[in-house]
Amino acid sequence: MKILLTSDTWTPTVNGVVTSATTMKRELESRGHEVRVLTLSQNSHTYAEHDVTYLGSLDAGRVYPGARLRGPALHGALRELARWSPDVVHSQCEFSTFSPARYLARAAGAPLIHTYHTVYEDYTHYFSPSRCMGRRLAALFTRSICNRCDAVIAPTPKIRSLLLGYGVQCPVQVLPTGLELTRFAVPRDDALRRRLHLPDDKKVLLYLGRLAKEKDISTIISFMPDLPDAVLLVVGDGPEHSALAQLVQHLQLADRVIFTGMVPPGDVPHYYALADAFVSASASEAQGLTYLEALAAGLPLLCRDDPCLNNLVQQGQNGYVWQNPAQLVRLSHTLLCRDDPDVLRKNAVASARPYSSAAFAAAAEQLYRREILRKTQQRQILQREVVLW
């Protein structure tokens, strides 16, 4: 098959959408498919490099940190992709590259598949002064996007239920993003531990991801005074970095909360390997790829209760979910004082196995073939009706 993936972001940007899309591309190519990508450039120039077409874009950081919007006059680049005539178009984002994805799918007579990666109602603080109004706008926007597609992929049952509640009418299939699991099986890097000044006599809690308001990292930092035998390693960057650093100074935790900033994607497994547990206070995850990465690295989870964790965390077996700060403190002590950390690690690795990148691509391939067949049948029925008329 000829498969076009469209995404507003691409490498070297590091986020869940890029991780999912690059994993998809790599695995589909390994199965013999021809895969191209349509994304935004980081400037106003439109160009192509190998199998990736970059559309000129404009800075939209005032709307959302790091965001860009598609520029005008892109017909030449789209005509070239239309001549290539993909068998299926798989959109990953709802904004700048969604309209080109629709155009190219129509031009090729191909099905348009869309993966819903982001729970926009959890991001209302970026675009609406009222959370209630923001939720209504998010539902309206999501419905208008998804109902223009032939099928929608939801990474978890949580997202499928959300979409159906919004009134999405097209077929919605649950398909968790997969990971290259063996990538996270790396030994602990003692030299890296020393460079980060992590004390040998303390347990290491890890948060890895964007530093943004919806991730509620301040809750994790605020409970660190109750865990004197642990340090918190915060890997990543984002718009909340400055506010979180100020909170650390206010709580006098500079020696027990370590910020690394952004790290190269290839180094990420080594940061997981430094930790004893992965901690998160986010309730805005569509799937939570970092949760899967942590499990693949053998880290038990210590995460805020969220429907995306259903069937992923077995309480006390591969981690714990918590519902309030008091529970977080109590369960942190429970986890870090367990006398069977090797059992926790073994259970964590085992629970990540069903989420392999190979299984992810195989399921996507099956969905593509089904939608291509359905599109072909619809076209044949329409042609027969025209002849009869």
Q: What are the functions of these language-model segments?
A:
Residues Q315-A326, T334-D339:
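Conserved acidic donor-binding segment of nucleotide-sugar-dependent glycosyltransferases
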Residues T39, T53-G56, R135, A139-R188, ...:
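Donor nucleotide-sugar binding/catalytic pocket of nucleotide-sugar-dependent glycosyltransferases
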Residues P300-C303:
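Short hydrophobic beta-strand element within catalytic cores of glycosyltransferases
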Residues A185-L198:
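A short helix/loop element that forms part of the nucleotide-sugar donor recognition site in Leloir-type
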Residues M1-Y54, A359, E365, V386-W389:
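N-terminal subdomain of nucleotide-sugar transferases
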Residues A283:
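Aromatic "clamp/platform" in nucleotide-sugar-dependent glycosyltransferases that forms part
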Residues C146, M262-V263, H270-A275:
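Short alpha-helical donor nucleotide-sugar binding micro-motif in glycosyltransferases
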Residues T19, K203-D226, P239-A245:
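A conserved mid-protein helix/loop that constitutes part of the nucleotide-sugar donor-binding site
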